[in-house]
């Protein structure tokens, strides 16, 4: 039996692929239909157009990743996604015929299903998993059992203790640890914290991606997909100034980190920022879901950057293998090196599918993550304390000190807060500590990580920060 924790795109695609090859699979998830995949609006980046190629997709990914992408991983994903997309289509999923353009991409390569791709494909895979008879259980992972560097099992809240030689973590990221986010409340980094406490290597936790255009409908955060700007939507302030070209010559199609800081700067200067959807031709047909909201709210919507994706996580190789034998990790819970310092739009669902569908190739042929080339690992001591912050306090702290623009004074304060907190029992505090500590240590600005006291890129390309739990 192979146990997969998480029922988003990565977990479901892995389960179906394994099941089709004859493996017994059980999916365990805090909420079967509650992950981030449902909220992905744009689509899946794949070089399937006649004027496109994996090499061009790779170039765009490396450019946006700002010197921190793992070239081998980028090669793997940009090449394999075309095969994986055809596999999912053979399973019965149908993408819309047209390819769309998003920020940072040099070609139209975004495969989509209406303007709600994440929900459409995740629902399809969930229904397929149910039809295949794959066991789906709602439960919460509490701990991994590891013996002599190998997975021995796990403990869940309801089910108790289980023995297992192979565990797949697909539990998502930690975006809900910030006050303003497009992520669901399940995304608090549990999988990362549990793996870390078990001895897994964790990296790149300082890189938190803010999506530039989040709005609110009916009091709820709503992601306004990158595709809107690819189809002609523009950003303006209350003076109707199209301000983005002051910050980047690519305008509305600049990478997310650039636009997020530009919008943040506009608000800091006293302006209000809107996205104007009126230039989009045939809007109702292209964006039928959003169109329902626009009929009530209009085509000029106030926007603000919100946390959308967390780049750091469990360090894995291109096979989804961690440094603990038998522990695989796929999806946003990982740090594969694909995204570098900043994720290219619609590469996350591509990564989910490539690592999920292809896991079957490696499940019986363990190689493990090689850490021989890791020059320095920072050990972090866990604290068992009665001092415990509420989740809302953590979200407020992270938004204030670990947000779009950071500085050493705020980060140092934040690290000290979490170091005095219960990081042994509280996963949210532990992951927040790793993120804040990474941001404090990275004394430069790169990609999604911006330090106003170190505004320039100064570290050598490829240098990343690794954490491991201290056993002393």
Curated annotation (Swiss-Prot):
Reaction(s) catalysed (UniProt annotation): L-aspartate + O2 = iminosuccinate + H2O2
Cofactor: FAD
Membrane spanning residue stretches: none
GO MF annotations, alphabetized: L-aspartate oxidase activity; nucleotide binding
Involved pathway(s): Cofactor biosynthesis; NAD(+) biosynthesis; iminoaspartate from L-aspartate (oxidase route): step 1/1
Enzyme Commission identifier(s): 1.4.3.16
Protein name: L-aspartate oxidase
Organism encoding this protein: Saccharolobus solfataricus (strain ATCC 35092 / DSM 1617 / JCM 11322 / P2) (Sulfolobus solfataricus)
């Amino acid at each position: 039996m192979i146990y997969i924790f998480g029922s988003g795109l990565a977990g479901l695609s892995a389960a179906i692929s394994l099941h089709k090859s004859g493996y017994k699979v059980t999916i365990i998830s805090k909420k079967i239909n509650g992950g981030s995949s449902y909220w992905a609006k744009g689509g899946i980046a794949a070089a399937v157009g006649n004027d496109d190629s994996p090499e061009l997709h790779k170039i765009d990914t490396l450019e946006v990743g700002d010197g921190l992408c793992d070239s081998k991983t980028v090669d793997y994903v940009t090449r394999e996604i075309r095969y994986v997309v055809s596999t999912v289509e053979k399973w019965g999923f149908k993408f819309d015929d047209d390819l769309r353009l998003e920020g940072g991409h040099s070609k139209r390569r975004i495969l989509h299903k209406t303007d709600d791709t994440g929900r459409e494909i995740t629902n399809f895979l969930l229904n397929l998993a149910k039809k295949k008879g794959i066991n789906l259980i709602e439960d919460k992972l509490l701990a991994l059992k590891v013996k002599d560097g190998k997975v021995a099992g796990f403990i869940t809240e309801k089910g108790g203790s289980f023995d297992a030689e192979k565990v797949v973590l697909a539990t998502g990221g930690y975006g809900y640890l910030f006050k303003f986010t497009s992520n669901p409340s399940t995304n608090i980094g549990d999988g990362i914290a549990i793996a870390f406490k078990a001895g897994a290597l964790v990296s790149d936790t300082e890189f938190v991606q803010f999506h530039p255009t989040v709005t609110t409908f009916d009091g709820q955060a709503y992601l306004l997909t990158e595709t809107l700007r690819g189809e002609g939507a523009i950003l303006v302030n209350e003076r109707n100034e199209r301000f983005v070209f002051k910050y980047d010559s690519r305008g509305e199609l600049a990478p997310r980190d650039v636009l997020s800081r530009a919008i943040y700067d506009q608000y800091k200067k006293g302006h209000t920022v809107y996205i104007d959807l009126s230039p989009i031709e045939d809007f109702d047909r292209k964006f039928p879901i959003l169109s329902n909201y626009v009929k009530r709210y209009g085509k000029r919507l106030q926007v603000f950057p919100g946390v959308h994706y967390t780049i750091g996580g469990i360090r894995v190789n291109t096979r989804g293998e961690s440094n603990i034998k038998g522990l695989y990790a796929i999806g946003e819970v990982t740090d594969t090196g694909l995204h570098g310092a900043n994720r290219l739009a619609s590469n996350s669902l591509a990564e989910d599918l490539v690592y999920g569908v292809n896991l079957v190739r490696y499940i019986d042929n363990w190689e493990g993550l090689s850490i021989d080339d890791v020059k320095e690992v920072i050990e972090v001591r866990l604290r068992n304390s009665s001092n415990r912050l509420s989740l809302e306090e953590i979200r407020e702290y992270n938004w204030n000190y670990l947000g779009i623009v950071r500085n050493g004074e705020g980060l140092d304060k934040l690290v000290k807060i979490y170091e005095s907190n219960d990081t042994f029992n509280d996963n949210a505090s532990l992951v927040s500590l790793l993120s804040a500590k990474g941001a404090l240590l990275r004394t430069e600005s790169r990609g999604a990580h911006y330090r106003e006291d170190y505004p320039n890129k100064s570290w050598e390309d490829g240098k990343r920060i690794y954490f491991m739990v201290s056993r002393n």
